[in-house]
Amino acid sequence: MNPRRKSRFKLVIFVVLGIAIASGLMLYALRQNIDLFYTPSEVIQGKDNNPNQKPEVGQRIRVGGMVVEGTVVRDPKSLKVRFDLNDIGPAITVEYEGILPDLFREGQGIVAQGVLTQSAVLSATEVLAKHDENYVPPELGEKMQKVHKPMGIKAADLKGESARDRQEKEGAK
């Protein structure tokens, strides 16, 4: 092999190794940030009722479900909150320290993100409250009222109820 070919070969090997190392580091970094989504039933029983597909203790996950009525316990001396979360099956316990979203309440759907500390206990770092498709934030609702009043649009129209819906309700009475 002549010296010119040798230097090209070294350059190609160097570039391929650089790309491989960069790809490996990217995959490793992304793997650290992947939070798999589970329902409370899947946390307890595994996905598709397969115990081999249960999240492991210490794994970062996201769990979505409904806050069980009567299970919200707040620590009076701190921002710690503990509540149960379920879907149609068994419930898991969520422990969270921080300010809960305004839409958080019992019987409401939420998504909690955190680390599974025991097989059925999630230490949440973030709690997101879900709302229905008709939700309008109060500030936006007020601004929309000001803009739409001159046009003759009623407040009920802004909350997802059309004139036809109101007529159907009145006709049913």
Swiss-Prot record:
SUPFAM superfamilies: Heme chaperone CcmE. GO terms for cellular component: plasma membrane. Heme binds at H131, Y135. Signal peptide: none annotated. Pfam families: CcmE (PF03100). Residues 156-173 have a biased composition (Basic and acidic residues). Residues 30-173 are periplasmic. Residues 152-173 are annotated as: Disordered. The chain crosses the membrane at residues 9-29. GO terms for molecular function: heme binding; metal ion binding. Heme chaperone required for the biogenesis of c-type cytochromes. Transiently binds heme delivered by CcmC and transfers the heme to apo-cytochromes in a process facilitated by CcmF and CcmH. The lineage of its organism: Bacteria, Pseudomonadati, Pseudomonadota, Gammaproteobacteria, Pasteurellales. It is a single-pass type II membrane protein. It is found in: Cell inner membrane. The gene is ccmE. Belongs to the CcmE/CycJ family. Residues 1-8 are cytoplasmic. Keywords: Cell inner membrane, Cell membrane, Cytochrome c-type biogenesis, Heme, Iron, Membrane, Metal-binding, Signal-anchor, Transmembrane, Transmembrane helix. Its main location: membrane. It comes from the Bacteria. This is Cytochrome c-type biogenesis protein CcmE. GO terms for biological process: cytochrome complex assembly.
